[in-house]
């Protein structure tokens, strides 16, 4: 893809995200600023701008992973557009059957994520190609959620016989002062982090 086209799509996606975002102070707890992107999903054209950008940025992806909850919307929409499988990573107790589990810290507490151990048992993998996985979520804060998701994704890939893979991550926005992007890069030097807008 031509660099000018890429930059054009990136700028349009950034503009649409800025116009859609609302900041709520002291929510869900005092001292926390919550970046709400709900309006993005209410505006077909703005959401489409984001998907257009992702379509060009991640044209070689084989599997999409969506994180509960807004990552489900982003992941499903992108996977459908690209005709790709979409795997869910959910909060503890939401998935049936044997699951891998990872705990993580967030800016206002702790939580746990789970993924089904055999989530990819029906996915067809091309043996000649490195399997490219894209993990999608809305906001990157301290990075704990994404780090736990990367660990779970690695576990489920290996458990389902996929050993040659690379992982990319995409987020609508980040809270820059929390250094989530830097923490991910520090822990995983082989994982890319794509953020449309850093606040």
Swiss-Prot record:
Pathway: Purine metabolism; AMP biosynthesis via salvage pathway; AMP from adenine: step 1/1. One of its GO terms (biological process) is adenine salvage. GO terms for cellular component: cytoplasm. The keyword Kinase does not apply. Keywords: Cytoplasm, Glycosyltransferase, Purine salvage, Transferase. It comes from the Eukaryota. GO terms for molecular function: adenine phosphoribosyltransferase activity. CDD domains: PRTases_typeI (cd06223). Its main location: cytoplasm. It is an enzyme of class 2 (transferase). It is found in: Cytoplasm. Its EC number is 2.4.2.7. It catalyses: AMP + diphosphate = 5-phospho-alpha-D-ribose 1-diphosphate + adenine. Disulfide bonds: none annotated. Homodimer. Catalyzes a salvage reaction resulting in the formation of AMP, that is energically less costly than de novo synthesis. Belongs to the purine/pyrimidine phosphoribosyltransferase family. This is Probable adenine phosphoribosyltransferase. It comes from Dictyostelium discoideum (Social amoeba). The gene is aprt.
């Amino acid at each position: 893809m031509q660099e000018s086209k890429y930059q054009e799509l990136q700028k349009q996606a950034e503009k649409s995200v800025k116009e859609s975002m609302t900041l709520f102070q002291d929510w869900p707890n005092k001292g926390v600023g919550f970046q709400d992107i709900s309006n993005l999903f209410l505006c077909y054209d703005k959401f489409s701008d984001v998907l257009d950008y992702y379509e060009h940025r991640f044209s070689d992806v084989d599997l999409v992973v969506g994180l509960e909850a807004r990552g489900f919307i982003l992941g499903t929409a992108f996977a459908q557009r690209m005709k790709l499988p979409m795997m869910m990573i959910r909060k503890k107790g939401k998935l049936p059957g044997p699951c891998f589990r990872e705990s993580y810290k967030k800016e206002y507490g702790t939580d746990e994520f789970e993924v089904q151990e055999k989530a990819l048992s029906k996915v067809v993998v091309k043996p000649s190609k490195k399997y490219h996985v894209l993990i999608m979520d809305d906001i990157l804060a301290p990075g704990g959620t994404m780090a736990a998701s990367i660990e779970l994704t690695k576990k489920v890939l290996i458990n389902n016989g996929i050993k040659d893979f690379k992982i990319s991550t995409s987020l609508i926005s980040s809270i820059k002062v929390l250094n989530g992007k830097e923490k991910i890069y520090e822990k995983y030097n082989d994982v890319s982090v794509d953020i449309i807008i850093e606040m």
